[in-house]
Amino acid sequence: MKYNKTLALIPAILLAACGGGDKQSIDEKPRPGSMVYSFPMDGQADVSPKADIVLRFSHAITDDEATLQNKIILQSSGQSQPFTVTLIDSGKSLKLEPANPLATGEEFTVTFQEPLAAEGGRQITTPNATGDDGIQFATRGAYAGLAELANTADTFDIAWQVPASDSPFQAMNFSTFRFAMTQPVHPEWQSLGGSIQLRDASGQEVPATVLVKGNRITVDPCVTPEPSQCGSKQDILNTGETYTLQLTNLASLTDSSEENRFTGEFTFTPRDTGPTVVLQQTAVDSGNGELTSVLNGQALNAVTLNSVLQGEAGPSQQTGDLFAELAYAPAFDADEALPLRIPKGSVLKSTSLNVLVGGKVQVLDAATGEDQQTGTIKVTMLSDASGYMSPNQYTDDINAPRHITLFMDVSMNTEAAQPNAALSQDLMGVELRGIALVRDGVLTIDAIGMVEPNLLGQEFTDSTIAFHLQAATDADSVLDAENLRELDATPPSLVSWMPGPANAVPATRQSMQRPGDPIILFFDEPLDPASVENGVELIENGAPVTNLQARLDGTALVLNPQGGLKHGVPYSVSVDGLTDLAGNRAMVSPLSFELDSIEENGSPGNKGFPLALTTYPGYPCETDYENTLDLENGVFGKCWTADANNAGDVLPVSKMPADRPITVVFSKSLDLDSVIVGETFTVQEIAQEANGTVTVLNQQVAGRLEKNNQRIRFYPEQPWQVGAHYRYILASSEQSGTCTPGQYTSICDEDGIPLKTDLLEGLNDGDGNNGPDNLEIVFTGSEARSTVFTPLRNLPIRDTNSNLAIDCDDLGSESCLEPFNHQGSDSEGFLPSANAAKLLVTQDHAEDARVGCAVDGADCPRKKFIYQTYALNTEVIGPTVDPDTGRDAVKVLLYPTQLATTSLDVHLSLLSTVSSTGPQVLRMRYAKDDPECTGASCARNSLIPGYITENDQGETIFKTKAELFLDAPGLKATASILGIPTDLPLTHNLFGYPFTLELEGRVVFFDDGRMQIEQRNFNVPHIDVEAVALGIINTEIPLIIPEQGVYLNFISNPVKEIPAQYE
């Protein structure tokens, strides 16, 4: 038979295979009813826990929804799961929506405890395709990173693979090989000694794209000389030759020990698929949602992303053509699955979306001030999508539709820079399950698939897509559409990058970069992983970095040298050889940046000390809880302070959601070797006896530690038990030798200085010889939350090296290590710079005292500021209404923490006294449980509420009200007595001094995906300092923070990261 005649048979073969014809006949004989499709399919694994269950029948169901809810049973481990039922397509489909997300890593069964009634008096009993009666499916492991939740088995192994010799899905000469593992693969699997290779019969390695992410592995052979031809008809393995796929020494993320490594070898002999034919399949437009899926009732080919951070974003209408290569049907028996593939590099585009916070508050483009749009959304296939058209598994009826199974690895990105950075990523193992029918010469595919993108690196979202594809197969259509597919000839273009150029919006982005933060390049299309190793270079101070780590995720290339970037060193990123999937070479000019310096010629000699800026869960102060701890009632203790009474509130015992890691952020880069699980970092399970004694039930909770230069995360092996109590301890000592390598007794920074936990007691509370000052934090396990934990850092800061001092000979100097850089003038005064606060003496005492300089001289507008070092954790709750304005808003809760600041001098006219505060501490107070409560006895256990909303100018803003304590444990006074500077013994009231800040400011979204929140005060807090010198000299200094005198600047974490160490 000649080839062109073979092709001419394809439409007729498709008609027969898909249960239809140009004029589909109707069998007059009544047929029994049956189920013909389900999502998930019977036996499907790695199903999203947020999936709805869809059932499709041969005939319309006549039971009402209430009856169906009683007849249909959804179970897991013998427990029924509540759900609602919706009739779709006049009853031919049912959608079951679970009341709550399904548990991860669990098996579920759908059965009918009574037959369902269908049209014509038919009865439809419990369906079955494989295994036990009913539809059996298993949900995926959790993305939380905790071993018990992420793993689907105790050992690292293959959970399932496709193709597989023992399944209907056999290896073909155009197959792509996919593996789902029982545990997530370690991101550094290659540097840990792992390898993945495909070899031919002679042992030679076969060129292939290897993709690894989460628990998924894909090996996509490409044997054509040109990358653009990957997935074409020429890209096939040799039929009849034996190939071997080797997975060697692969490490698991949750247990990378040698004992848990995976090694496996798989041999296969690919089956011939030729002569193949390519069909052009078109994604049908839903007409603004008018056309809906017969399977689940959703708009056809429409993408809606469900999340807390962006609300319900969509629908975005998918458009475009896919070119599916089908195997030669006559070579396959009627009961065999007919293989197909869609070539690597295929693209589906979706229409632009408006970007909102929480689905309610408009995001603005930082550069233009216009409403932020995504621009065209693209989904690009990173490997050949491979699938099968199979006989219907639920019924033997020859008129039933065929089943479609399609596996894809895709990259998603957007046209506009900010949403591109927020969404760009690889989505591995996307699985479509659907049905295929031919009607009037048109092959029609209806399928359901789910994707779960990680938004902003903070939240796993979900989207269910109802695909509807059509391909004409009649005599007038193109017999083979291979030549209609346009090949990509456009090189990739850089859209944005982090930290960004010197003129980025805002211009301070390079000053916000810290060791541990990566460099991220965001392109407009995915890159070829094979081009990364030699296609990009990081130049440090004129020399190439030899230990550069690189990761590719979607269109984002993430770079970080081992040990992190360094302060005060010029860097340049050189791109020379990066290509897209088709081999087109990127052209990018060198990207230069530099982190702010933290020292000059070895100065300052005062290196400061590392502080715990945020502790999650908990409050970052050394706590006195021996006589106050009450675990049952959630009472912890008070921060130790230099005041004899430990001024301040009693802190609550924090609640910790079951699936979250302990996270601690530090002010300086750590000596990561000093963070030792079970020694300097301990996590215990505890209990409290009736007499108040604390008992340690587990000396060290099993888990893994993820270290970055200025942050650590501890993931417990098992979820925190609801109602169980825990304590974690960060070791700190002021004893000499505590930071000796190999003999650490403290967590230490890179300068060999131990963690300081007791700043509230002063810079030196024991002359360097007062033993341990461990930071101990107690918490209680609680249920997992659906809200989004969003950590923030306060950058940029003038005190770049975080030593709580400004390293300049003069505070107003602009030519020093940490130069003065404020808006304003010496004549008119200055506004605070980012993360600074301005203090003034009240006007009625201007002759008695002045901030920064002597009362009898010229004023000093540059010396009226303190500079803060801190971080902040937040919880994004979701849509609400601004209680002040009634406008749409998104509620955000703030976790209280403490801020460290530089010193401030206040000069008095009396005896020319200079009062120096020393480093100060601002403590955020927990909110009142009852906002209407007044007085000192009000219970304070609640997080601080805030709101993202719009102001009268249409700008996105954040507003909150924070109650604080001010502590100045090092406050001292120096007087001029007979012309001699003399220190005066001093008592004062700056211990737990309460005041309130009412804050508001813009929310700005960077083109690298990060969010910036500016906060300025619009009230005028009074701080009335009362001091007694020598026991007899009473002094009052009435200070104020003027309106707009506080400027706080928060930024969210980078959207991608490369941890420095995993343990």
Curated annotation (Swiss-Prot):
Tree of life domain: Bacteria
Residues carrying lipid (S-diacylglycerol cysteine): 18
Xref: Pfam families: Big_5
Outcome of gene disruption: Mutants show a lower rate of biofilm formation on solid paraffin and on the liquid alkane n-hexadecane, while growth on nonalkane substrates was not affected. Planktonic growth on water-soluble substrates is not affected. Mutants are impaired in the assimilation of n-hexadecane solubilized in surfactant micelles.
The keyword Membrane is assigned to this record: yes
Topology versus the membrane: Lipid-anchor
Subcellular compartments: Cell inner membrane
Induction: Expression increases during biofilm formation on n-hexadecane. Forms an operon with aupA.
Protein purpose: Required for growth on alkanes. Probably involved in the uptake of micelle-solubilized alkanes. May facilitate the transfer of alkanes from the outer membrane to the inner membrane.
Subunit comment: Interacts with the outer membrane protein AupA.
Entry protein name: Alkane uptake protein B
Gene source species: Marinobacter nauticus (strain ATCC 49840 / DSM 8798 / CIP 103578 / SP17)
